[in-house]
Amino acid sequence: MMIHINNHSIFAFSDTHGRHRDLRVPEKTDILICAGDAVEDNLLGDEYDDFIEWFSSFPAKWKLFVPGNHELSFELGQSEKIEKAMSEKGIQVLQNAVYDCDGVIIGSIDADSSIADENIPTDLDILVTHYPPYGILDDDMGSTEILNFVMKSQPSLHLFGHIHSAKGQKYQFGKTLCINIV
C-alpha cells in the first residue's frame, strides 16, 4: 500500500508468507516497510535469503522490517543472525525501536511488550506493528499493549498486518489513522 507523509512516499506491506515477489513495489518509494510474516515458518533458510535479497534490491532510501509471528527465528533466539544479514543489505530491523527517516519518526513495539512505555517515545509519526491494536480491525486477535500505546501516543499512522480478512481496511482512531497493510 502506498502512503504519503511529510513529502515522503512509503510503500508498506505485510504477510506475504514467501510470496513477496508477487508484489509490485513502485519505483519512487522513499521508505519501504515490511510489517512481518515475510516467510512461512522458515528458520534461517533459503526463504529468508530470498526475501532479504529481494527486499534489499529496491532503491528506497530506507528499508524497515518488523518481525511477525511467522518469523520463528526471531522467537527462537536467532534474531542476531537475521538482523546482521539484513543490516549488511541495508535493511533496518525495528523491534521495540525507533528510526528517523529524514524527519519521519517511525517506531515499532511487540504485541506483548510491556517495555513500550519505557523505550519508545510518544511523538511518533508512524507506528508499525505486526499485530493490530485490540478492537480495531482485529477479529478479536489484537493486542491490548498496542491499543494502550496508540491511545497514549496518537501517532498520525498505525500500520499493521496479521489479520488477512481486514486487508486494506482503514479506521480512524482519534488522531491515528489505522491501516491494515496485508
Which residues are covered by each model-predicted region?
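Conserved beta-sheet core of the metallophosphoesterase superfamily
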Residues: 61-64, 134-182
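Binuclear metal-dependent hydrolase catalytic cores centered on His/Asp/Glu-rich metal-binding motifs
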Residues: 89, 102-149
